[in-house]
């Protein structure tokens, strides 16, 4: 009998922000998939979950290429999929750890799409997204009343960024490290700097 595949959001970095359901799934798993990039040793998601790991847990590191287009390196993704399916076919429950929430700008989304047509039981467990944690961290409401809220990837086209930020009452711009100077300039040109907050590694 095949095992169950769990996608677990470990939140923004503080192990105490994991949900009770996430902790129970981690404790019950036979195997943990710890995603990492080619350029870095170890897995940030794994380190966040480490306080809840049982001693005999099997840990499998998988490298996920940081590419804009999934098709650019589909071979690596297919290899990871095959490894996960092999573990599930052994009857093992496999938990895939991911930062923040599994269904929000997450590597897990691609893994989920690869497995959802493979007759696999999939359980996705939500986590706290970084921008939600930031509101509490800096003591600023993210959105209130009838405000319109937008989430924008920092990699979006500059004109698109400006267009969305002009109509949103509040916005979270994610992953700004590639073009932070352009985004700060945009905020200045639109007189938004007084209300803006720049946060790095919010939960770490």
Task: Please annotate each region the language model reported.
Residues 1-15, 20-22, 27-121:
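Class I S-adenosyl-L-methionine
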Residues 34, 61, 96-98, 124-127, ...:
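General beta-strand structural signal in soluble alpha/beta enzymes
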Residues 65-70, 157-159, 204:
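A short acidic, often aromatic-flanked loop/helix-cap motif at beta-alpha or helix-coil junctions
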Residues 1-2, 24-25, 88-89, 96, ...:
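Solvent-exposed alpha-helices and their adjacent loops that cap or buttress functional pockets
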Residues 7-9, 97-99, 152-153, 173-175, ...:
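Short beta-strand segments
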Residues 39-42, 67, 129-132, 180, ...:
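Short gly/pro/ser/thr-enriched loop/turn and capping motifs at secondary-structure boundaries
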Residues 5, 165-204:
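A contiguous loop/helix-start segment that scaffolds small-molecule binding in enzyme catalytic cores
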Residues 103-167:
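Class I SAM-dependent methyltransferase SAM-binding "motif I" and its flanking Rossmann-like core
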């Amino acid at each position: 009998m095949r095992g169950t595949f769990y996608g677990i959001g470990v939140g923004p970095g503080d192990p105490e922000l994991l949900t009770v359901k996430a902790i129970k799934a981690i404790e019950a798993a036979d195997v943990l998939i710890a995603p990492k990039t080619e350029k870095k040793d170890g897995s940030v998601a794994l380190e966040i979950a480490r306080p809840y790991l049982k001693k005999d847990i099997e840990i499998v590191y998988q490298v996920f290429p940081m590419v804009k287009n999934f098709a650019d390196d589909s071979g690596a993704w297919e290899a990871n999929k095959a490894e996960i399916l092999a573990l599930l076919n052994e009857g093992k429950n496999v938990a895939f750890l991911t930062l923040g929430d599994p269904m929000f700008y997450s590597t897990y989304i691609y893994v989920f799409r690869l497995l959802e047509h493979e007759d696999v039981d999939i359980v996705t467990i939500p986590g706290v997204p970084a921008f939600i944690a930031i509101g509490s961290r800096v003591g600023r409401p993210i959105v209130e009343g009838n405000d319109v809220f937008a989430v924008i990837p920092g990699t979006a086209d500059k004109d698109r960024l400006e267009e969305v930020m002009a109509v949103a009452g509040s916005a979270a711009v994610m992953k700004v490290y590639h073009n932070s100077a352009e985004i700060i300039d945009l905020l200045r040109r639109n007189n938004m700097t007084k209300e803006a907050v720049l946060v790095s590694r919010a939960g770490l």
